[in-house]
């Protein structure tokens, strides 16, 4: 595990910067990007032409994913979508890869699970939604296990897995943040897993800076809003972010796009010191013991990895809520019900 702000975090930051422009490094890596793109295209073609058959798990599947690497806001989107599907009369379940956990077979993630056993994002989703969550690198196996354990589930939401073509899907939603497709190059020359032109049913864009939407069809704004912070040791104790304005604050995040979390706090009137941790940082020990601050603000994704042994009274958790466009919800619901949206 890399230390905070260590080599891995610095490498992630360097690549993120390079992927936003077509500099010398990006051009040098384009031959590798061509190979990557060819392999990805062959795999897509194999399923599109029927040479490989996707597996129908018996209920509609909504995939919430991205075509770029790094965090874009998928997890709060999945949580909001599950709530919206419930409100529309569905009984949703969720499947995920379980990244960061040593998962080899389909595994249920419950509110009592540990992040090390099922992954931080699936655990957060389970705690926020109360819906059945199963994880496995083979999402088909995860979906089949979920259905066997919960036969009342009538729609499955796949957290990520856009490129997991073996899982048949009814709806594909692609989430972007303000970086969109970066320099437009495929990995490793750019951030793209697939071309921006890839088919999807709808695109969601979270851009807290300009709020502008790209001129793509079926594109909707995704608003991520921070709520009142809650105390890690006393979750019932809550404080509006504005109350931290006159305190010495450290903001720390082990997520795919930590700068977005920091920008959210700044937009709330705070001026925190910041620390970017590697994505899925394991928190084997307390990296904040030497920080002379009054409060430490962390993400919900990081909070689920901090067990009962953590006793740092300065830790506050900032929840984020996703607001989905009602037109997007209507589009998804109509597709799930087998009708074209009006």
UniProtKB/Swiss-Prot annotation:
Pfam families, per database record: LpxK
One MF annotation (Gene Ontology) recorded for this entry: tetraacyldisaccharide 4'-kinase activity
Catalytic activity, reaction form: a lipid A disaccharide + ATP = a lipid IVA + ADP + H(+)
InterPro entries, A to Z: LpxK, P-loop_NTPase
GO terms, biological process: lipid A biosynthetic process; lipopolysaccharide core region biosynthetic process
GO CC annotation terms, alphabetical: plasma membrane
UniProt keyword list: ATP-binding, Kinase, Lipid A biosynthesis, Lipid biosynthesis, Lipid metabolism, Nucleotide-binding, Transferase
Entry EC number(s): 2.7.1.130
Transmembrane segments: none
Keyword Cell cycle among record annotations: no
Summary of the function given for this chain in its UniProt record: Transfers the gamma-phosphate of ATP to the 4'-position of a tetraacyldisaccharide 1-phosphate intermediate (termed DS-1-P) to form tetraacyldisaccharide 1,4'-bis-phosphate (lipid IVA).
Similarity remark: Belongs to the LpxK family.
Protein known as: Tetraacyldisaccharide 4'-kinase
The organism of origin for this protein: Burkholderia lata (strain ATCC 17760 / DSM 23089 / LMG 22485 / NCIMB 9086 / R18194 / 383)
